[in-house]
Amino acid sequence: MQTNKERLIAALQEPLESTFATYKTSALGLVDDQVEENRDTYGENVITKGQEDSMIKKIYESIINPFTVILLVIALVSFITNVWLAKPGEQDPTTSIIIVTLVLISGGIRFIQELRSDKAASNLSRMIVNTATVLRDGSEQEIPIDEIVVGDVIKLSAGDMIPADVVLIDSRDFFVQQSGLTGESDAVEKVCLRKADSQNLDSLLESESLAFMGTNVISGRATALVLVVGDETMMGAIEQTINTYDEPTSFEREMNTISWLLIRLMLVMVPVVFVINGLTDGDWLEAGVFALSVGVGLTPEMLPMIITASLAKGSIIMAKEKVVIKKLNAIQDLGAIDILCTDKTGTLTQDEIVLEYPLDIHGDLDLSVLRRAYLNSYFQTGLKNLMDRAIINRTHKEAKKHEIVRDLDQNFHKIDELPFDFERRRMSVIVKDEDGVVSMVTKGALEEMLSVSTYVEYKGEIKRLTDEVRQEVLAEVAQLNEQGLRVLGVSYKTDLDENEIFSVEDEGDMILTGYLAFLDPPKPSAAPAIKALAEYGVTTKILTGDNEKVTQAVCEKVGLDVERILLGSEIDTMTDQELAQVVETTTVFAKLSPDQKARIILCLKNNGHKVGYMGDGINDAPSMKVSDVGISVDTAVDIAKETADVILLDKDLMVLEKGLVEGRKVYANMTKYIKMTVSSNFGNIFSLLFASIFLPFLPMAPVHLIVLNLIYDLSCIALPFDNVDKEFLKKPRIWEANSIMRFMAWIGPISSVFDIITYMLLYFLLVPMILGHGYNHGAADAAAFIMVFQTGWFIESMWSQTMVIHMLRSPKLPFIQSRPAFSVVVTTLAAAFFVTSLPYSPLASILKLSQLNGLYFVLLFAIIVLYMLSVTVVKRIYIKKYKEWL
């Protein structure tokens, strides 16, 4: 079989019929029976992003991580000392069995959660499908891109993403943006085989008749034959040979910072605890096992699962709110945005533009203006925007009553066109009428039309465009703009040579025939949505290519206060430093090119803002790519959907507001777990240091530490589903390692104080009272003393860790001002009561736990109440000092 390069070269050199024969297809496309055969022969149209992990690998990765490796080392050491090296009759594998069981339980829970999350992500990704138009059995069909096979004949038009490597077999004014492959930012014209002057066989990317997967159509139309699919395409080859790098989000960076902080703490604490206990007890092996257990206790090993569960839960809820998340981390980023940049069309307005008035240069209704506008909109092969559709619809309506606009598509035929671009802000078509007269008809932004017009037409009479007429036109248009009407100018020139090769230089010395006034009414939901976003700390900025007066009028109608308006022409004269200052106080940016939009967003980001960009057009893709969160809609062009991180199933700011709130809920519940766990573990450091220095025995057996840690983690599984205070949702939130470390330093030591109080009560009061003797009363009595002491601290640790969750989860008073989710109440109480019941269960002898008397539980209740009151007092001081809690 030929290589992909050989196939492309052969298609350029051989007659088209020969190429059709090679792939058993025709100009009418593949027949259904041939589709599967070609798929088997040439492969599927899927680029391998990395082989999907096998089930065994997924299980392995769920169970094996740095923390479980430490646990398994402890289990191995315990097995060696308590089974392998133990004397006959003294062998006890209990600790090893418990540790291995806990590892399997923890890994199993994570594995199940990961499977659920993967399934949720897969279901969500299937909700957004890029499609292509193919010819099968001579009829057009819309199919998912991954179902395309070699030999398919596809139809391409403006806004499409090219789904495979193809050769053009027919084309009309077909321009492609292939900067992703070549780095060249300008659109490149492609022509079909029969029109190509020559083909560059040395650099296939420069071939006039080949187009490649991943590039997108800027304007025009084409019919193409699919030659190469999937991994063998140019894009597929690049994917296979380079490591794609995604810049880590602020969330990922802060998570890395926190992880390394915990690792450093562990690396310091484990050796210290090992040395102190070894010197105190003289049992270095036992000290080593305990030190490793401390290492496990200091690490929130369930953190990856909690994060995954929070993000997956958030994505599922958002899907119900018509928000599809393409990347899970985008949920948190969406909640963090404090500036939303968006175009006004379809966001603030209804996306249903109506042509209100076709006007001559003096502002009177004139259907000859509509006639020429129709020729431009109907015959252009670019993506027909809302105004093109409005022109065509109005013409069809008027054609029922007025002959001047009847049968225009039959009375004219197209010669050529000059596609729209964002520099000229206009587009032209060249048409010939039944009498053989060739004309160029141009429409575009009024200022641009005045710049290329030398004459004006009024009631059939052509005069020179004077400054007086120019000012009259501008004044009339300004008045329309202030009413919220968008205005396009229409110019033309006649008696052209149809054999001429037309270019943008021909757009000159034209006759301005009039202008078109469009109404794009505001959405009823726009005003409340903007108000809601503002209440959530999100500033809305409008970035548009439209006229500033129209944009201002629309903004006023939807209640968006316009602080300042900045034009694209002004931006071009500014340095980045100047623009960075101005963007802070500007609400509306008008008459922008795509590059200017992207530059504004970069300036906002450099100023420290988290920026979301919402768009749906070809020109929006660069802005979405540089923003923190790219937002699009399911009706957007393919390239916009491909670039977006978040896709709305309804182009409505109200929908976005719901997604933003859910993002903040996800952040809130993840930060709860991290701050609670890190502060609790930090407090344990001081408790264990004190115990290691002042107690003549281990305050808790290694197996106790491990069981305690696992049950506490299981009690936190419900946190992703916890309620979040409404006040917390009102501000954008970003991850800050400093905030987490500060929280840890304030809250952690409080638990240490009460742990030490528990030590003192157990050592000097409770254990002697229960046993009738102190620690130094013989070896057998010492063993009993240690068991009761360890049981007492084991239970107190669980109660303090789980009950304080309710104090820490909100800055408000728990249960009175802020109610936790029912699942959080159930899991925390279940964990506390389960641990409390262990000394009275059959597991007591296995875990070496002892029953406690009533006085212990009275004192335990007092300690927990005092602990929670102390946390409340410190919480108030902390909030007053730092103006934040979570």
Task: State what each model feature region is.
Residues 1-140, 146-149, 154-162, 167-247, ...:
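Non-lumenal N-terminal regulatory segments of integral membrane proteins
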Residues 44-76, 118, 140-141, 201-210, ...:
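Soluble-to-membrane junctions at the N-terminal ends of transmembrane alpha-helices
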Residues 64-84, 100-110, 129-130, 260-278, ...:
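Alpha-helical transmembrane segments of multi-pass membrane proteins
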Residues 73-98, 261-299, 312-322, 500-501, ...:
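Helix-interface capping motifs at the ends of transmembrane segments in multi-pass membrane proteins
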Residues 95-129, 136, 246-339, 516, ...:
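Hydrophobic alpha-helical transmembrane segments
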Residues 210-218, 333-512, 518, 531, ...:
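Cytosolic catalytic regions of ATP/NTP-dependent phosphoryl-transfer enzymes
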Residues 273, 304, 311, 558, ...:
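Membrane-embedded transport module
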Residues 527-529, 535, 547-558, 595-603, ...:
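Acidic, divalent-metal-coordinating active-site segment for phosphoryl/phosphodiester hydrolysis
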